[in-house]
Amino acid sequence: KEDGYFVTGGTRIAVPEGKLNYLRAQGYINKDIILGIRPEDIHDEPVFINASPETSVKCQIEVAELMGAETMLYTSIEGQSIVARIDSRSDIKPMDTLQLGLDLNKAHFFDKETEARIRP
């Protein structure tokens, strides 16, 4: 973690100011932390990604599982597995590469050593 960004490998993801303030206040800048985000808070819509490009990541889809009204996408960021739940109208197949936008306003951060949630 560096000031203003969650960093994993070569990927930098901007942290919203509100979350950044409580991470700073509790001394978590430049410390290892865990980022948790629910599948429904990961988006493939261009309008979301364009509005917040610093919270989007490029991924290669490993599995795309159509589940009726939604599709579950399985991929990874710098070796860390993630799952995204997107609208089934998106025609995404395994091995496709796409940008996914992370809604970090809804993300949770955890202390790497204790695995306890870092609360505001």
Each PLM stretch: what is its role?
Residues 3-5, 68-74:
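Short aromatic-glycine-enriched beta-strand elements
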